[in-house]
């Protein structure tokens, strides 16, 4: 059985959905795993979204560990968390010292692991791009796709490192961003300057929103299918590298078929 740790800020429905799809699969016997703990860098009463998230965690009877990064920063008199990240990470590691795991998941975790934390708690992270795609926030990624008139987008699951979005990849899903549903949206931005589009529309640009939505609906099944691969022993992590069942470093697994099958069975909804 795969023993998982779970890190999340728990800001909204996306974080709740990622936890639920995995916890529900465990309860159904579909995923041979258990969630040993959920860590949240907020505390009860700090944010309504996080409070909802903590209630969800408790409904699954999963041990919940909290330590407010905002309160820690203020207590340290630091201008930002980055300047005291390693000290914060050490306190988190102390809180989790007795909770051993095989693998951890960053699912809506708003902080970046420092080097020591990344080594101590080997974790998987989601990034909204294909393995050879852009890095950065989801907004930066999609704007770059639009600017380059890219043919596809996707989501990758990789090992979290202190080098943001550059950890060794484990799995991915990709999907076309031209064709049905997309072509009219591309036509609406044809020949227009990317900076002008950002200034006028920002995140409300229909093409940007549609690419984002298609990526989001694939995140949950991608995470679940990836954890199934790890639970089966097909993949594992050794020396912070993704390796196959023989212990050989391997390329990321494409899970397009599994993800699209899940979406089709759900009637295209998540």
Label each PLM-derived region with a short phrase.
Residues 1-270:
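One-carbon transfer enzymes
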């Amino acid at each position: 059985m795969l023993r998982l740790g779970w890190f999340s800020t728990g800001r909204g429905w996306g974080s709740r959905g990622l936890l639920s799809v995995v916890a529900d699969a465990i309860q159904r016997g579909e995923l041979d795993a258990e969630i040993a703990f959920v860590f949240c860098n907020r505390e009860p009463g700090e944010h309504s979204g996080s409070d909802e998230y903590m209630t969800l965690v408790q409904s699954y009877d999963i041990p919940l560990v909290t330590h407010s990064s905002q309160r820690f920063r203020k207590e340290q008199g630091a201008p930002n968390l980055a300047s005291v990240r390693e000290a914060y990470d050490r306190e988190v590691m102390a809180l989790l010292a007795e909770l051993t795991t095989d693998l951890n998941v960053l699912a809506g975790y708003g902080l970046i692991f420092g080097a020591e934390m990344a080594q101590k708690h080997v974790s998987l992270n989601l990034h909204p791009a294909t393995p050879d795609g852009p890095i950065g926030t989801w907004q930066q990624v999609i704007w770059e796709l639009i600017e380059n008139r890219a043919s596809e987008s996707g989501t990758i699951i990789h090992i979290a490192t202190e080098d943001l979005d550059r950890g060794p990849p484990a799995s991915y899903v990709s999907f076309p961003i031209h064709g049905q549903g997309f072509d009219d949206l591309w036509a609406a931005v044809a020949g227009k300057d990317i900076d002008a589009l950002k200034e006028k529309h920002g995140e409300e640009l229909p093409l940007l929103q549609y690419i984002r939505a298609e990526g989001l609906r694939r995140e949950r099944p991608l995470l679940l299918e990836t954890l199934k691969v790890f639970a089966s022993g097909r993949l594992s992590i050794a020396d912070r590298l993704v390796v196959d069942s023989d212990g050989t470093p391997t390329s990321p697994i494409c899970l397009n078929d599994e993800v699209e099958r899940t979406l089709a069975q759900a009637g295209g909804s998540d």
